[in-house]
């Protein structure tokens, strides 16, 4: 259920550099790896996995387990297309757990057995909460996207837990990270439904959903369906991104193809057919949504502006298309995230009051 494909490492660095340096790695170290990498798939000097893993191992040897986890996260990026990427993910998890005592939060890892297509599947989750978590607080479920997973967005999860003083349940969407099932719209949504039900049992019953990138597809889906009490969609595709009219860039065809479960590069027709079932048009045509906050950068090369602006005019929905930034507004997150935190705080508190 994986395959490598032609991918220019220098182009990936060009696109993801802001994300690399804004999530906790020193600029100089990122620049050193960037200068050393000449091939995406070679597990040898000059190869993406090799050079990022070399940096990660140096951090680990120095006891900087948080940075080691981040660097191994980039080593396995953008998908688990071969054995060396899978090794990097295992090492990322190891370093992440070693870093946990210094998170400044209560951390717990669990593997949930959730309903899936007539059977069950295991879903590893990470629970983060303040040490002095008040009783009777809401719970947030949160995920990254198709190539940046729960451990890769740790910094944002910490902000959510500490600033909102609640428990965050972090997971990988279907087809990514530690998930063992392919990404589909219905199947992935079924797993999210199981996570929502579990989250309602952990706090006061009020649950919010924060989704980043492709994770935003699933938070849009749960928000539009009214399955949660608040939904944040950060850079999520919902409709136009799934049409054949757009061209994939920066290797996104292979990233998505791997997540969908192909074991060899699909044809354009095969990829388009799988993508078509993700459209949220049926839910967009209904009026039963929970309160929603939709945010993205106006210059996103992966998700058309339509997929943000289509939410304008909806009941209980705030839309923010941020100028001068791209996918998930990543270069302006220090400006955008306080808005997200403020909206969540108000919306979840309103839901708590309404439930009393």
Enumerate the language-model features and the residues they cover:
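Hydrolase active-site cap/lid region
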Residues: 221-273, 290
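Catalytic histidine-centered segment of alpha/beta-hydrolase-like enzymes
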Residues: 79, 325-337
